[in-house]
Regions:
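N-terminal nicking endonuclease/strand-transfer module with a His-rich metal-binding environment
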Residues: 1-290
């Protein structure tokens, strides 16, 4: 949850998007709806949104085009396999507001998009990348008496890993059996985001007492990669996102619920502070009346 400690932190979430939900994800990200349940979206500001990669067709059509061009492979996938994922890059609203707002946010997320290309494995696997600049931060707007917007970046992509296809025993040339027939980019969310061995300073795997390697959650690796990329790009005044989270892959709904809960916690804290201040004022007035 939000810490409210005044420290600016990078954050990136990896969301699993089902085939059933991808249409709604597209409508939300590309602002194709006539109305939205999220009251923070200001339609008059939609023109301020910035595409770093604009989709030339629907997300599902783009996926089909990648498959037809053999850029990706779905061979052997289960019927309920996840074909799409979404990265949501974020920093608290105050960070951008303190650096001038919109123009700074555009540059920051242009660099974040470059990080996304590395994380995903290539721009060809990205279906859409758009910075939203039309969602207002109501808490800050109310506190500062002017409009403050919450800038963040949505990147929808196809999760892939390199896979070698070997010649089978049915091959007529027995010398080829077991050798590499072709290399494909296999669609696989689970393998793309598998936990990785934790390495020591010398680059060797850290082992448990039983001799097995200590695994580092893919969520933690993702946070590290984004933070390190942005630091290298010159953003030295931000800190890494929260550590120790057991969170791996949130669904879009779970992510939105979490963000709303963070905002609610922030507003509740502000309300508590105001209540305490009001109580102190009332006590002071009461004492003066008794005098």
């Amino acid at each position: 949850m939000a810490r409210n400690d005044g420290i600016d932190r990078t954050s990136v979430r990896n969301l699993a998007v089902s085939d059933k939900a991808v249409g709604n994800t597209q409508q939300h990200n590309e602002r194709e709806k006539d109305s939205y349940r999220n009251p923070d979206i200001i339609p008059q500001r939609t023109a301020w949104n910035v595409h770093f990669k604009k989709p030339t067709a629907s997300y599902t059509d783009l996926f089909a085009q990648l498959e037809a061009a053999r850029t990706i492979s779905t061979r052997g996938l289960k019927p309920d396999a996840t074909h799409y994922c979404e990265l949501v890059f974020d920093v608290n609203s105050a960070y951008f507001d303190n650096h001038g707002g919109y123009e700074f946010a555009k540059q920051f997320y242009e660099d974040a998009y470059k990080a996304a290309v590395q994380i995903v494995g290539g721009e060809q696997y990205i279906l859409s990348a758009v910075m939203h600049a039309d969602e207002i931060n109501r808490a800050m707007t109310e506190a500062l008496g002017r409009e403050v917007y919450h800038y963040h970046l949505h990147v929808v992509y196809v999760p892939v890993v390199e896979k070698q296809i070997l010649w089978s025993k049915r091959c007529k040339d027995k010398a080829l059996v077991g050798t590499v027939k072709e290399t494909v980019m296999q669609v696989s969310r689970s393998k793309k985001w598998a936990s990785k061995p934790l390495l020591d300073e010398s680059g060797k795997p850290v082992l448990q007492k039983n001799g097995k390697p200590v695994l580092k959650k893919s969520y933690s690796v993702l946070q590290d990669n984004f933070f390190n990329f942005m630091r290298a790009a010159g953003y030295t005044d931000v800190e890494r996102g929260e550590r120790g989270s057991t969170e791996e892959h949130l669904t879009v709904t779970q992510f939105k619920v979490q963000r709303e809960q963070e905002r609610l916690d922030s507003l509740t804290a502000q309300a508590d502070q105001k209540a305490q201040s009001l109580a102190k004022t009332s006590q002071t007035l009461s004492k003066k009346e008794k005098e």
